[in-house]
Amino acid sequence: MELEDLYSFKIIDDPQISNDGKFIAYTQTVASKQYNNYRSKIVIYEIGTKKIIHEVTDDYKNCFPRWNINNELIYLNINKENNNYSIKLFELYKKNCKLVLEQETSISDIKISGCNNYISFLKYDDDYLNYDDDLKEEVLFLDRFSWKSDSLGFTGNSYNHLYVYDLKNSSLKKVTDGKYDISGYAWSNKGSNIAIVTNKSSTNDFERKKEIYYISNLNHSENNKITEFEEIRGNDISFSPNDDYLTVCGHDTKEYGHYGLQRIWLINIKEKKKICITENIDISFGDYSRNYDLKYFGGNDKIEWSRNGDEIYALSNEYGYIFLNKININTSKISRIFENKSVIYGYVFDEKEEKFITLEATSNDPANIFIYENGNRSKISGVNDELIGNLDLKEAEEVWFKNDGIDIVGWVNKGDKIFDNARPLILYNGGGPGGMRTNTFVFEYQYYAKRGFTVMNCNARGNYGHGEDYSLAIKGHWGDLDVSDNIAFLNNYLN
């Protein structure tokens, strides 16, 4: 296995099922060695024939596929060379593309309104403070604390805001404005109401707190604050089928910080009241896998409602794996949709809730799309199967051990070479902690194992997956208990 094998892997992301349940659209991304960039295409798969029927592709990135009610595909075309970000519409049956809207700066989180009359997205403002200054090549002027991001890079003094494009009138409107970021939002199922996740406090750069506002009129920026939470890490929000309730994942205990579990909350919009429906379920919900690799656009990991209004679907973080569940909002009864030994980091389903599409990774396969229907589960992609076979990539060994009387899980990618009568070993202690270390694909783990190094990593205390006490254990003991767990893992394996 060589480092350049990384260019041969295909990254699968963001599956979306059409409204009639007949088609799946997803992105497939490759790293181009020739052009030193990423290129993405949208693949359209027909469920009935089990065949790929079309690919939306060019020399750039085509991503964020979103189906409208007419089985047309709204998507984003990114041409960074020309600073062009175009929202386009692909007519499936005519195999025809139309330009809807162009922007000169990056946009994200594209959605279609429930009434189908609007397209929305998030976009960072221009950083005017550093726009025309003579010193801009030498000096960075800042008036906000959060001027960079681990995922986005440099954002400067910009704030992320919500824009809505009126398809009937061909007009674009900036819905929110001010010194705050919109971190998540959702359209109501009927009409054109929006719920947003933000923090409008003047000290928002220094707070984990998130607020939820309800926008009932797109022509007025005054919003109706519904409630707030001490933390919402995922920033995903959903309306109930009748639009009376919202669901989010988060916690409301300030002293827990980012160690608190992301529990599921039900919010009554009219009464502005919230209730935690998973208070007695010791699980964090959403995708919080933190050691994944070869994930580019990700997938839908938010709470989704059943059409009956009494149940929701949610991803759960448990002992290094992520499962898809159904939860009754009245009884809090939770049940898995199917059993799996993988990391599910995206899912969608059809309107009849008969077909469940999941995006999954394992320790020797970065991503595949599965369909679960009528009790049967099958893989519908497999773009890396031949490469995985040729490289002979092995699954990691799962190892359970104890430290301080606590059960901890870890994984080992075994190397098979001996150097000078010794077997070299690499122990990854992870970052954070926070989130959950999972039994998922990491290119460098496989690469080092092929080079003869045994590679180890574990879900030490401070992470999700083993309950809230486990996650809170290192609060005030950061660098102590988590390091102790890693060393105990090493000693246990060596012994």
Task: Give the positions of each predicted feature.
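Cap/lid segment of the alpha/beta-hydrolase catalytic domain
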Residues: I283, V383-N495
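Beta-strand-rich domains and repeat architectures in extracellular enzymes and scaffolds
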Residues: E4-S40
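Predominantly five- to eight-bladed beta-propeller fold
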Residues: R39-S40, Y124-Y163, K210-E211, L261-I267, ...
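Short loop/turn segments that connect beta-strands within beta-propeller blades
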Residues: I47-K50, E91-K95, D166-S170, S216-H220, ...
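Beta-propeller fold detector
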Residues: I53-V56, K98-L101, K173-T176, N223-T227, ...
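Asp-box/WD-like beta-propeller blade repeats and closely related beta-sheet repeat scaffolds
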Residues: N83-N117, L122-F154, Y159
